[in-house]
Curated annotation (Swiss-Prot):
This is Ubiquitin carboxyl-terminal hydrolase calypso. It is an enzyme of class 3 (hydrolase). It comes from the Eukaryota. Residues 375-403 form the ULD domain. Catalytic component of the polycomb repressive deubiquitinase (PR-DUB) complex, at least composed of caly/calypso, Asx and sba (MBD5/6 homolog). The PR-DUB complex associates with nucleosomes to mediate deubiquitination of histone H2AK118ub1 substrates; the association requires the positively charged C-terminal tail of caly, probably due to direct binding of DNA. Interacts (via ULD domain) with Asx (via DEUBAD domain); the interaction produces a stable heterodimer with a composite binding site for ubiquitin. One of its GO terms (molecular function) is chromatin binding. Residues 457-471 have a biased composition (Basic residues). Transmembrane segments: none annotated. Pfam families: Peptidase_C12, UCH_C.
């Protein structure tokens, strides 16, 4: 398909209709201007992605945008340094009452002017399960290129889709192989099975049986825009005061949105910020601190050397010239410079630790991605087969997979049995203790007479004796 054509051909029609698969032999022209290439990688369609800042950060790197990262926002009131935009994930249930309230509210701020729509990057989501990539591109492709290096793929996509309709921009995204392959490379194996089992539909970003959706909030020309690929138009929330930042306007919009959405005690959402790579700012700060450290250290050495020469008795000696661009020796004593040098050493150590922490985070992003995307099915099947071959699988199943009701019933029976045994033991003990005095008397009589005492006659014998006496 020719991306600039905006949906020409059967393949574009299939994508627009929501097909989740393409032919193995399909040849597509990408929006990046590359030559046609086999698209076997896209044969299974776009897959669902988790809502994870580490995943999104690695996905941006795969897109070719290296100086950006994604962070999760836990507190709206906490200031965020230089964000490019925000990505909001929420549960998508069309019939929900709060959802209808949001639709009624946002319908009033739709931007329907075609010229205004063409001047920004707004793409409709015509490819299922691509909402994560749509949300990232809605932020990145509406940023000032002077402040952000997009990379070759995204720069060409932005250039070639300029002036397209929102639907054609969505088709261009869906048929850009670099984006699709990068997107699918971060999906879990369950996503492919879920796609094969349920088919295409609204993207669900966590496998809980409920649909979730991403939208983006970005500042464009002094206005706060909300870009939702499932809406027909972009939404303009208006501008902000000169004395405030655009994030202040965003906080007010989100506070109102969450107030509506949580009217039924539903707070299942999360918020992420697209920000500059923190390591760049830390590295730049470390460079400045080390430069200042070298200047202060050099000035201190010269000052100490001059003081030593003065104390040696050479009164005619002059202090050597020192740099005047940053520090004047006459304005600082040796103690002042030593204190300043100590503070610089502390700041350098703190920032080095911050840089190490950020690098460790990136490493853990990669570790988590490997665990997330690895298919453990073969290992699990082989492991269970080995257990069955050794004849221990059945025993393990009987030990660990018993029904809970059966287990609880056996526990109750055991408790009753223990109580019965305890009661029986108590009764026998009481009887034994009651017969103890009588037994002692018998033992005493035996010891005195040398023979066992006669047994006490029973009731029947006593009755006969009474009758004989009467006679």
């Amino acid at each position: 398909m020719n991306a600039a054509g905006g949906g020409s051909g059967a393949q574009a029609a299939g994508v627009a209709a929501g097909n989740s698969s393409l032919s193995h032999n399909a040849l597509l022209s990408t929006a990046s201007g590359a030559t046609t290439m086999p698209m076997a990688q896209l044969a299974d369609g776009w897959l669902e992605l988790e809502s994870d800042p580490g995943l999104f950060t690695l996905l941006l790197k795969d897109f070719g945008c290296h100086d950006v990262q994604v962070e999760e926002v836990y507190d709206l009131q906490k200031p965020i340094e230089s964000p490019y935009g925000f990505i909001f994930l929420f549960r998508w249930i069309e019939e929900r009452r709060a959802r209808r309230k949001i639709v009624e509210t946002t319908a009033e701020i739709f931007v329907k002017d075609e010229e205004a729509i063409s001047s920004i990057f707004f793409a409709q989501q015509v490819v299922p399960n691509s909402c994560a990539t749509h949300a990232l591109l809605s932020v990145l492709l509406n940023c000032n290129e002077n402040n952000l290096q997009l990379g070759d793929t995204l720069s060409r996509l932005k250039t070639h889709t300029k002036g397209m309709s929102p639907e054609n921009k969505g088709l261009a995204i869906g048929n850009t192989p670099e984006l699709a392959c990068a997107h699918n490379s971060h999906a879990m194996p369950q996503a492919r099975r879920r796609l094969e089992r349920t088919g295409a539909g609204v993207s669900s970003c966590r496998f809980t049986g409920e649909a979730f959706h991403f939208v983006s909030f970005v500042p464009i020309n002094g206005q706060l825009f909300e870009l939702d690929g499932l809406k027909p138009y972009p939404m303009n929330h208006g501008g902000w005061e000169d004395s405030e930042d655009w994030t202040d306007k965003f906080r007010r919009v989100m506070a109102e949105r969450l107030g509506i959405a949580t009217g039924e005690q539903d707070i299942r959402f999360n918020l992420m910020a697209v920000v500059p790579d923190r390591r760049i700012a830390i590295t730049h700060k470390l460079k400045m601190l080390r430069t200042n450290q070298a200047i202060v250290s050099g000035t201190l050495q010269k000052l100490l050397k001059a003081d030593e020469q003065g104390e040696s008795g050479n009164g005619d000696s002059q202090r050597p010239d020192t740099p005047t661009t940053l520090l004047e020796p006459s304005a600082f004593t040796a103690r002042d410079l030593q204190s300043l040098l100590k503070n610089l050493d502390t700041e350098i150590a703190i920032n080095e630790q911050h840089l190490a922490d950020e690098n460790d985070r990136r490493h853990m992003f990669k570790v988590d991605a490997s665990r997330r995307t690895h298919n453990y099915d073969k290992f699990i099947c082989t492991f269970l087969s080995m257990l069955a071959h050794q004849g221990v699988l059945g025993e393990l199943v009987s030990q660990h997979l018993l029904p809970s009701k059966k287990v609880s019933g056996q526990g109750a029976a055991n408790r009753i049995s223990k109580q019965s045994n305890t009661a029986s033991a108590g009764g026998s003990t009481t009887g034994a203790s009651a017969s103890t005095p009588k037994t002692q008397q018998q033992q005493a009589a035996t010891a005195k007479n040398g023979k066992s005492p006669s047994k006490t006659p029973g009731r029947r014998r006593k009755g006969r004796n009474k009758c004989r006496k009467r006679k």
